[in-house]
């Protein structure tokens, strides 16, 4: 019988897809969206979107959302303070200065072809869309984030294309691939668990 390894300091379990778009033909980011769908955390379940969009380069101007939108403020605070604020692409954009805003979420999926999340707050709707997954694989990594050591496991689908729309207006930007350990700047991440190991 194989040995069962038990780790108890589970901080987050759920989903954490990402979309990062670049100014076409460059390495300059114009939008970063980190979506969290939490099944378990010490702060409870819920959904959160941490997002930054460059108002000028994206073509959205004053429509560009910057901040954290959620249906569980405590959970959103947990993922921001513990994880997202240490991600260099989300630093220096004033996200930490914005009040966490209440939002509603819907999700639509069509296997490897399409995955869509809509985040609505007030009269505004942000849509994230991942298209044409290129692969599916399981990973286990042990990164250091925020001064803690973690074991992170997930099922990843790097995507060929992705987009962000705000009230139907698309961000002007493109996905880069290959990029990073997940081989695309837009990927789905399911069955994701963050366990503190040090």
Language model segments and positions:
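Targeting-peptide/extracellular-domain and disordered-appendage signature
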Residues: 1-198
């Amino acid at each position: 019988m194989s040995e069962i390894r038990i780790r108890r300091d589970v901080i987050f379990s759920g989903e954490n897809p990402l979309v990062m778009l670049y100014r076409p033909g460059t390495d300059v980011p114009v939008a970063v969206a980190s979506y969290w769908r939490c099944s378990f955390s010490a702060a409870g379940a819920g959904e959160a979107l941490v997002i930054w969009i460059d108002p000028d380069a994206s073509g959205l101007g004053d429509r560009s959302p910057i901040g954290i939108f959620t249906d569980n403020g405590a959970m959103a605070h947990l993922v921001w303070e513990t994880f997202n604020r240490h991600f260099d692409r989300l630093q220096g954009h004033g996200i930490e200065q914005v009040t966490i805003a209440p939002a509603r979420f819907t999700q639509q999926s069509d296997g490897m072809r399409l995955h869509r999340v809509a985040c609505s707050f007030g009269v505004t709707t942000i849509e994230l869309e991942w298209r044409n997954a290129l692969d599916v694989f399981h990973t286990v990594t042990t990164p250091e984030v925020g001064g803690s050591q973690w074991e992170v496991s997930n099922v990843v689908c790097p995507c060929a294309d992705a987009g962000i729309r705000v009230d139907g207006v698309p961000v002007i930007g493109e996905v880069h691939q290959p990029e990073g350990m997940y081989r695309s700047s837009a990927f789905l991440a399911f069955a994701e668990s963050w366990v503190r190991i040090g």
